[in-house]
């Protein structure tokens, strides 16, 4: 069979299911592919195939994730579903599958449970911008008051973690009914259709990397006689054009310079775009004034910081991480984009030690500033070996 052509005509949005174990995340994922295949003509994926998610590695961490795709009238959705709670934690912290919005699945029969809370907290920490709620298993609840109660609990929980609980769309339905093609009381197919329409309207179209302000992590620095200093790297976002003023941020005091040339595969270009590996020629900058680990950026768009709150996952022994716990005063290297910087960890009150396999909130103080913003991912290393993964949740100074 010929490979299907990838249609690029609809905006692409990344979503995923989150919520407590056995509340119906995978069933809903399968139901979404079924309903969308019938209504909008995308391919359906069976429950078993999603449930036996393949292992993948992200930054040396093994994560089980299922990826499915479906279409609405106006969008193409890429959807991630994880079989186990630990997979969610790793997935969200490493940013292996970044979400533009999440579908929180909560069983109407059970109400919010510990992982419901933890996934909402993680979404806040790692910067998932929007959450839509699907109150599942509603066919098992006869009491309308009970449904209202669960809905109120979920809204309160969202508000606790700074999501707009009162304005969050909540769809009531049964994923299993939709998966079986049933629709009693509009709880099956209709509810899932309504969910897709809600994703279309409630989650805004993400800003593409190319439309965001220019940023390029510096990987290497060369001096070309007669032409000046060239820094190379992969443009993370935005576009850099010749004669534009750019800032060099991180590790040292921020300096301004001008881009006097862009080259790619030894060809001269007039701009470098998101996703491209290129060399940028800097006017009047000396070879020893820039180094790996700094970034080039559009002036004023990113600042250097040393202290931040992070959400961290500590690799287990089986994943090649530490064999022993660490304690307060732990000083590993934090690997941001292209370089390691030493930093110290301050653990939350009442936490004495952190075990391999845990996830934890900590405050990190680096010995040198790094160009940083909320949502930036990093690795924690000891002597070049990765022992953890983290994300900047909040910048302190």
Swiss-Prot record:
Protein name stated in the entry: Elongation factor Tu
Organism in which the protein naturally occurs: Ectopseudomonas mendocina (strain ymp)
Keywords: Cytoplasm, Elongation factor, GTP-binding, Hydrolase, Magnesium, Metal-binding, Nucleotide-binding, Protein biosynthesis
Catalytic activity: GTP + H2O = GDP + phosphate + H(+)
Region (G1): 19-26
HAMAP family: EF_Tu_B
Region described as G5: spans on this chain: 174-176
Subcellular location: Cytoplasm
Gene: tuf
Domain tr-type G: start-end pairs: 10-207
Family: Belongs to the TRAFAC class translation factor GTPase superfamily. Classic translation factor GTPase family. EF-Tu/EF-1A subfamily.
Record SUPFAM superfamilies: EF-Tu/eEF-1alpha/eIF2-gamma C-terminal domain, P-loop containing nucleoside triphosphate hydrolases, Translation proteins
């Amino acid at each position: 069979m010929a490979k299907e052509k990838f249609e690029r005509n609809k905006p692409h949005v990344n979503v995923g299911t989150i919520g407590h174990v056995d509340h119906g995340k995978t069933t809903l994922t399968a139901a979404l592919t079924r309903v969308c295949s019938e209504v909008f003509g995308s391919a359906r994926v069976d429950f078993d195939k999603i449930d036996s998610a393949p292992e993948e590695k992200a930054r040396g961490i093994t994560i089980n994730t299922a990826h499915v795709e479906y279409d609405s009238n106006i969008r193409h959705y890429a959807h991630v579903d994880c079989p186990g709670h630990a997979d969610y934690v790793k997935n969200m912290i490493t940013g292996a599958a970044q979400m533009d919005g999440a579908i929180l699945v909560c069983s109407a029969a059970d109400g919010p449970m510990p992982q419901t809370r933890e996934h909402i907290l993680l979404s806040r920490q790692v910067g998932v911008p929007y959450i839509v709620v699907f109150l599942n298993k509603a066919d098992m609840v006869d009491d309308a008051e009970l449904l209202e109660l669960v809905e109120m609990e979920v809204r309160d929980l969202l508000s606790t973690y700074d999501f707009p609980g009162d304005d969050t769309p909540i769809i009531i339905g049964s994923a299993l009914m939709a998966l079986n093609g049933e629709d009693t009381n509009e709880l099956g197919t209709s509810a899932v259709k309504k969910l897709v329409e809600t994703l279309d309207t409630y989650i805004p179209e993400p800003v593409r990397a190319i439309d965001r302000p220019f940023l390029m992590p510096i990987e290497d620095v060369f001096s070309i006689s007669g032409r000046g200093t060239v820094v190379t790297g992969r443009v993370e976002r935005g576009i850099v054009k010749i004669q534009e003023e750019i800032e060099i941020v991180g590790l040292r005091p921020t300096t301004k310079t001008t881009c006097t040339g862009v080259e790619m595969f030894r060809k001269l270009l007039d701009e470098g775009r998101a996703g491209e590996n290129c060399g940028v020629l800097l006017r009047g900058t000396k070879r020893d004034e820039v180094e790996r680990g700094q970034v080039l950026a559009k002036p004023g768009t990113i600042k250097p910081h040393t202290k931040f709150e992070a959400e961290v996952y500590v690799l287990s022994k089986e994943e090649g991480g530490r064999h022993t716990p660490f304690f307060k005063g732990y000083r590993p290297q934090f690997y941001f984009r292209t370089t390691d910087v030493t930093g110290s960890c301050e653990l939350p009150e009442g936490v004495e030690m952190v075990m391999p396999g845990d996830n934890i909130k900590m405050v990190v103080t680096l010995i040198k500033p790094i160009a940083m913003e909320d949502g930036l991912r990093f690795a924690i290393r000891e002597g070049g070996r990765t022992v953890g993964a983290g994300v900047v949740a909040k910048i302190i100074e």
